[in-house]
Amino acid sequence: MFLLSFVLEDWALHELLPLKPQRATALLLVASSYVTWTFQMHTFSNSLETIIVLWCLVLMGRMRDDREHTQVKLCMALAFLGVLGIFNRITFPVFLLVPGIRLLPDLVAKPFRLLVVLLAGSLTVLMAVATDTEYYTGSRLNFSTLFQDCILTPYNNMMYNMDSANLAQHGSHPFWQHFIANLPQLLGPAIPLLLSSSRKNILFWSGISGIAVLSCFNHQEARFLLPAVPLLLASIRLPDSSKLRQTWLGMWILFNLLAATIFGLYHQAGVLPVQDWIRQHEANNPQHVFWWKTYSPPRWLLGQANAQITTTDLMGMSGPQMMDRLSDSISCEQGTAHEVLLVAPGSATFLDEFTSTADSEASGLSFDLAFSHRQHIGLDDLDFGDDGFEPTIQRVFGRRGLDVWRVSKICPASG
C-alpha cells in the first residue's frame, strides 16, 4: 500500500490539477498528512477505495477533455475500475455522484461510449461474481449452475448495511458524526481553510457529497472518509499572507506529528500483541475468545492454535448484549467449558461494575484480569454524543490499554 499510495495517488493528483501552484500545494498537503502515513498505509478496503476514486476521476476528466473520439480503452478502464470499486466497498459510488452526473451528457452524446462501458462493466461483474462464488463456496466453478449458486457480495453487503440492527452491532453514531467529529479528526487545521477559502471545484464537491451520503448511515467511522481526504486537501488555498501561511503550516505540522503518533503508535495498537499473547498462552487450551470494541482480530496470527481457539468478534455490540453472549457461552454443566476470554479496551467503562469484586456476583459472572497491553487506544469509541467532549477524551486516553479477562460463570455449589 505504501508504493500504491505514494505513486498512484500522487500521479492522479498530478493529472487532476493541471495548474502547477495548485498541484504543488495539493501534493504537499497530501504527502504531509498523517492520514497518508497511517490509515492509507494499511491494507484497508478504504485505502484501495481512495486510489480507485482518484483514478476514476482521472479517467472521467480525460473523457471530457476529448469529446470527439469514443476512447474505447478509457471506457473499458473506467468500467473495470468502477466494478472493482463497488466490489471492494459498496459505498464507493457516493464519491463519484457529482462527476458521474457531469459525465452523463458526454456518454449520451456518444452512445457507443455508453455501450462500451456497459459491456466492459458486465464482463467485469461476471468475472468478479465467478471469483467470489468459487472463493466463498470453496468448490470448482461450474458455469451451468453459476446463476443459481452465485454469490453477489455487493448485494449481500448492501442488504446487511440496510438493516439497522446489523449496524448497531458495530456501534451507532449521530448523523453529524462525520462532519463534526470525523472530518476534523482527519483534517485538523485544514478545516478553517476548507470552509473559508477552498476552491469549489469538482474535487471539493465529490468529497463533500460523498460525506453527506455516508452521513445518512448511523455507523460512521473516520476511515470511511479516506477517499475524501485527498479530494478536499486538493481544494484548499493556503493563506495569501506570508505570516499567516507560516503560522498555519506550523500548526499543520504539529497536528500531523501528534496525530501520527496517536494513530500510528497507539490507535488499536494492542490487537496484535494481545492476539500473540493468546497464541502463546492458550495454544494448548481449547478456548473461546470474545473481542469487544476493537478492530477485527487477525485469526491467521494464531497459527496452529487457530484450530483450538474459537474467535468471536462482538464488534461494537451494546454492553448488555455482550454480557448475554458471554453468559450464554458458559455452562455450569459437567464436561462443558466453564471459562471464556474477553478482550476489551480499558476505556470500556461498562465493564467496571462487573469486574469489581463487590459487584461481580450480581451478573453471575466472574472476571479475572489475565493480561493487559498498555499501548492501546480505541479512537473508534469516541462517544461525544452521550458522554460529552471532555469526559470522552479523559476516558479514552486516561484509561488506555487492551485487557484480556478470564470470564467464568458463578455456579451453585453441587451438593
Q: Where are these predicted regions, by residue range?
A:
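Hydrophobic, aromatic-rich transmembrane alpha-helices
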Residues: 177-202, 211
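Transmembrane alpha-helix segments characteristic
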Residues: 30, 147-163, 197-218, 247-255
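Membrane-interface helix-loop-helix junctions at transmembrane boundaries of multi-pass membrane enzymes
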Residues: 104-119, 192-208, 216-220
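Perimembrane helix-loop-helix junctions
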Residues: 58-86, 90-125, 234
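Short acidic/glycine- and proline-prone juxtamembrane loop motifs at membrane-interface regions
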Residues: 38-48, 222
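Catalytic lumenal/periplasmic loop and adjoining terminal transmembrane helix
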Residues: 242-414
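Transmembrane-helix signature of polytopic, membrane-embedded enzymes
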Residues: 1-4, 8-33, 205
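Transmembrane alpha-helical segments
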Residues: 5-17, 52-64, 97-101, 188-198, ...
